[in-house]
Amino acid sequence: MVERFSDEARNTALNELPGWSQVAGREAITRTFTFRDFNEAFGFMARVALVAEKTDHHPEWRNVYRTVEVVLATHDAGGVTERDIRLAEAMNAIARQCGGI
C-alpha cells in the first residue's frame, strides 16, 4: 500500500502542479480542465482512461460539454499519495496535447 502524504508534502507537490488545488474538507486534490469543445474533452478522458487502467489508479471525474472536473485521492491510503501526483502530472501533459485551455 502507498503512504498518504503529510500536509507539507501534499502542499509542496501541489505547488509543482499548475491548476491543481486542495479539495476543501477532504484529503484530495482537484482541477477543472477546459477544452475548445466536447470532442477535445472526450479525447482527453479517453487518453487519461488508458493511463488510469495501466497504473490501476482511477480518477473521480465529471464531464459537461467542454469541461472535465477531476478529483484525485488514494482511497486505500485515506488521502493524497504519490500515485495521485503522478496521475495529475499525466493529466496536465495529456490536456496540453488535447488542446486544453
UniProtKB/Swiss-Prot annotation:
It comes from the Bacteria. CDD domains: PCD_DCoH_subfamily_b. Gene3D superfamilies: Transcriptional coactivator/pterin dehydratase. It is an enzyme of class 4 (lyase). It comes from Nitrobacter winogradskyi (strain ATCC 25391 / DSM 10237 / CIP 104748 / NCIMB 11846 / Nb-255). Its EC number is 4.2.1.96. Coiled coil: none annotated. The keyword S-adenosyl-L-methionine does not apply. GO terms for molecular function: 4-alpha-hydroxytetrahydrobiopterin dehydratase activity. GO terms for biological process: tetrahydrobiopterin biosynthetic process. Pfam families: Pterin_4a. This is Putative pterin-4-alpha-carbinolamine dehydratase. The keyword Lyase applies. Belongs to the pterin-4-alpha-carbinolamine dehydratase family. Keywords: Lyase. It catalyses: (4aS,6R)-4a-hydroxy-L-erythro-5,6,7,8-tetrahydrobiopterin = (6R)-L-erythro-6,7-dihydrobiopterin + H2O.
